[in-house]
């Protein structure tokens, strides 16, 4: 799909990865609406990058746990931007709880992670289905995690939410075909992000050593994979892993 003059909605556009995705889509010719919660300064910085690229930017405050807020955001982007061709479900929430410490993962925390990371993307995809299908080929790209492919992320709740998002990708690819293609990007450790900076040095260095390329991904790498999937006309229901080639996540068929 040619991306010039397409309208993209990126959730969590105020963060490191979301901001990079917005920048890459703007560079590819898209007008970009982005959602944020709390981080107004980050959202405004991203919007400035989009407008500096000569594209329109639109900010939307969104609570991904609230169905009314989700429906309002969907209506907002269509009204303000004249439609929506691309949805990037990037926004997520996490809390670091080691897997064995089940007693620390209470029901409220579990619900917050799953509602933000899985329920929210489903509801927003559903709300924008007609708008995405109205053009010459809509696109949804879900940003998951390698933690959704195998245990090892910062909490069981996060890992399960991202596994669900990967399978939601498969399900929506069937449900929304042929008008909308639905794909997924699963990052590993992403250099330079706030989440990566919170990791112990030994953990980050271990990830770099294990990667067969000798390095892990950056926010720009995640953005590039997202743009690739937006452009692709015959890819749907797929997950691209961006982690430098971690042996445990590789499948050579």
Go through the PLM ranges and name each one.
Residues 2, 125, 177, 215-242, ...:
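C-terminal substrate-recognition "lid" of short-chain dehydrogenase/reductases
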Residues 14-15:
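Conserved glycine-rich cofactor-binding loop
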Residues 94, 99, 150, 236-253:
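Short C-terminal tail/terminal secondary-structure segment
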Residues 98-114, 196, 207:
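Substrate-binding pocket helix/loop in short-chain dehydrogenase/reductase
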Residues 125, 161, 169:
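Active-site helix of classical SDR
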Residues 130, 173-178:
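Alpha-helical segment proximal to the catalytic Tyr-Lys
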Residues 145:
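Residue(s) in the substrate-gating loop at a strand-loop-helix junction
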């Amino acid at each position: 799909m040619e991306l010039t003059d397409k309208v993209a909605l990126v959730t969590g556009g105020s963060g490191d990865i979301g901001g990079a995705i917005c920048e890459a889509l703007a560079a590819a010719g898209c007008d970009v609406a982005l959602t944020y919660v709390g981080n107004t300064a980050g959202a405004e910085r991203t919007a400035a990058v989009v407008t500096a690229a000569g594209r329109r930017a639109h900010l939307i405050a969104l609570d991904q746990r609230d169905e009314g807020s989700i429906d309002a955001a969907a209506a907002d982007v269509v009204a303000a931007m004249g439609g929506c061709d691309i949805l990037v479900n990037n926004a997520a929430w996490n809390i670091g709880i080691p897997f064995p410490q089940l007693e620390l993962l209470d029901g409220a925390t579990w619900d917050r992670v799953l509602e933000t990371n899985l329920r929210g993307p489903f509801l927003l995809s559903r709300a924008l289905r007609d708008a995405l299908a109205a053009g010459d080929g809509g696109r949804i790209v879900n940003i998951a995690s390698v933690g959704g492919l195998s245990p090892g992320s910062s909490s069981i709740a996060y890992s399960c939410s991202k596994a669900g998002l990967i399978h939601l990708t498969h399900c929506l690819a069937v449900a929304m075909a042929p008008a909308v293609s639905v794909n997924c990007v699963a990052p590993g450790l992403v250099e330079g992000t706030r989440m990566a900076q919170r990791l112990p040095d030994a953990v980050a260095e271990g990830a770099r050593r294990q990667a067969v390329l000798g390095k892990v991904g950056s926010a720009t790498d995640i953005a590039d994979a997202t743009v690739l999937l937006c452009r692709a006309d015959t890819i749907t229901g797929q997950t691209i892993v961006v982690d430098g080639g971690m042996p445990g996540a590789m499948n050579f068929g």
